[in-house]
Amino acid sequence: MRLDRFDRSFQLALSDAQSIAIGKDNQFIEPVHVMYTFLKEKKYKSIRNLLIHAGSNVDQLYKSVEQVCNDLPRVESVDGDREVQCSHALVKILNLCDKLAQKYHSNIIFSEVFIIAALQSQDVLSILLKKSGIVKELLEKLVQYEQSNYSIHDDSFKNRTQILEQFTVDITSLAEQNNLDPVIGRDEEIRRTIQVLQRRTKNNPVLIGNPGVGKTAIVEGLAQRIINKEVPEGLKNSRILSLDIAALLAGTKYRGEFEERFKKVLYAVSKDNNTILFIDELHVMVGAGKTDGSMDASNMIKPKLARGELHCVGATTLDEYSRYIEKDAALERRFQKIFIIEPNIENTIAILRGLKERYELHHNVHITDPAIVAAATLSNRYISDRQLPDKAIDLIDEAASSIRIQIDSKPEDLDRLDRRIIQLKLECQALKKESDELSKKRLEILSMELSQKEQEYSVLESEWKRERSSLFDIQNIKSDLEKAKTILDQSRRIGDLAQMSELQYGRIPELEKKLFNAIQSSNKKMRLLRNYVSEVEIAEVLSKWTGIPISRILANEKNKLLNMETILHQLVIGQDEAVRVISNAIRRSRSGLSDPKRPIGSFMFLGPTGVGKTELCKALSQFLFDTDNAMVRIDMSEFMEKHSVSKLLGAPPGYIGYESGAYLTESIRRRPYSIVLLDEIEKAHLDVFNILLQVLDDGRLTDNQGRMVDFNNTVIIMTSNLGSDLIQKKFDISDYDTMKKTVLNVVNQYFRPEFINRIDEIVVFHPLSIKHLIDIANIQLKYLYSRLEERGYPRTGITNKALLFLSKIGFDPIYGARPLKRIIQQYIENPLSQKILSDDLLPGRSITIDVQNDNIVFIQNDVIDDKDIYIN
């Protein structure tokens, strides 16, 4: 027996078999050790595939061989000096391998020959091979073909297998090992795919759909059905290989190297009628590997697709299919389109329930059913630029991840105690150096507190560790249950009824009962940790994604909506009609009565300057989103020229800036829940109004990239100063009705009827009176009070007399409240800053703003007790 004649794979297998024999304390290397190595290690996958093609039930054979290996006699070695040698049976089989290689006129002994030699021997391995259902004649033909063609061709069975292992991923093998997520629903799409695959010609389906709808999942579902024998006879022995295009391209240094690799893959796939090639992102094939004058990958697969030699399934998106595949008519006609639509909310919930166990096992948390329903409904409502079920799955995944981080981190109560203990220890160390009585007394008090805190910490820490241990026990039980279910599926496939019975009626019910008891026990005892995902965590994650306040997502704002006018009036003074109109629109939207295909509301604010048009927009942004930053403010004076209109939607193709995002559409794509303020709308070019017609009517807009932008969750507010010149010249500012009629006439003359008719409400703001200005001044001064408080001046206030004095000086019916801000700066902020810098006003004491002899004065007191004072 010459080992140098064995191929590299066979030599490695013999070395691995020797290691297994040593590990199991066996005295000799037996043939079953070699077979166990072939079946166990992934690097010998070609042997496994050979056995499958020869009709062997590989799973059953593996279990039988493993059992025989475990039952072999053991001879334990204390010092490890015993040498393991080949048994007489193995030597006979190896000699027979040499004889068979000579019969096939081969100078090299391949590992595949070992199977024939083992089958012809009288060893126990021969019995196991025959029991597995192997067909001897078919095996000999396959090996003979391998041996006879090796020296001449490079396309032998073994080399084909190695090429496929290098450049593809076996999806059916992943399904067999239970490494794929379960595919729930999608029965119609999978059935349609099977139907196309069974056709005589054009049996190559291409799955087309938006990103995230589950195209790849359908192929995985098909692989699972193949493993479970739930497909027609023509597909029962098939396997699905996913093409790894990155592996094909990686390391291709020279021209033609990619084409050579790809041609080998195509040849290997076409030689096996039971192999289906899956090309994810099919559009990548168009242009892949193409250099000057050479063919790309798509042109290489066309002939094989046309002749029916290649069984192929593709997947791509709608946009990329139209951009790449449809342009090549010859390539398009060789595929049969299957459109994958987005599942509805009910189907998404079913999908999430099916995936629930996998995510629970991964994160070691419990995902409640309300969380699943919330993930499907909220993602559908608030995330408009992605598809179900992908966005709902991501919500569940991230929410479960946040709970897992909390479990792994130290609880807040424990962390607070830990920091307090460190602080007390530092103080005690410092006080030990002092010798006065006060320090000693303080040290005694701190030592008692430290002892108490350490005791509390010890109790809490032990409880935290116990709760964590309980959660990890649950995870281990879930993991064991998952493994048991996987083995049950494998036993069902190979028909091992004894093991099926043991698992189905013994092991699995026992683990399920154990899991139920562990969960019930942990729920009663949990105080520091929380191991379940609820709709609150889903809403928190969604709030971080979209910037929408969590209270709004969870619909906890009913009282807030009912009192919306009161809240807005705290910031906007004297505009009851405008506040009422805005509040009604928001309430209609929240109650679900408004048209879902239009913006929440579209308004035009008219009136003289300085009456609160822009301020109302800021107040609305604060009310809806708890921030002023949720407002997209566009100054329409920047769009007076015709060429500047393209900035709203983006530059057309061929122009500089085509790739960069548009101002309006890009802002809404990134933050779909916002207020769009179109300031001074009358200054915009007429083409801007043509764009706005579609937004106001349909709630959507298409940008220069062809992407649909959804405006259904925006509030569109346009402000205008139309008619303000007439107001200043002809009318008494207090005559509101006349002023409103005049302004509306001007608006109707300026804007086209189709634009006016699409606006929900046109609001003419009321002019401000001296009473309104007093309230506005008080609001403005509150911002000053907060800044003073930060500088160390608490409880700043102003007298009624001083407030009236400022309001009278700042009152101008033509300019509204804008002059008031300048008056506050001039009369209060400027002199106040001088006094602070000159130390006339000391920190830590209150400041009262008063008026004496028509001059503002600042009085500093320890306590303010004047009832005639506005206090922050």
From Swiss-Prot:
Tell me the segments the record calls region NBD2.
557-767
What are the GO MF terms of this UniProt record?
Answer: ATP binding; ATP hydrolysis activity
State the coiled-coil residue ranges: 393-525
- Tell me the segments the record calls region Repeat 1: 6-72
Q: Which UniProt keywords apply?
A: ATP-binding, Chaperone, Coiled coil, Cytoplasm, Nucleotide-binding, Repeat, Stress response
The residues that the entry says bind ATP 1 are: G209, N210, P211, G212, V213, G214, K215, T216
| Positions of the Clp R domain | 3-149
Q: Does the keyword Membrane apply?
A: no
Give the quaternary structure. Answer: Homohexamer. The oligomerization is ATP-dependent.
| Family affiliation | Belongs to the ClpA/ClpB family.
Protein name per the record: Chaperone protein ClpB
Organism phylogeny: Bacteria, Pseudomonadati, Pseudomonadota, Gammaproteobacteria, Enterobacterales
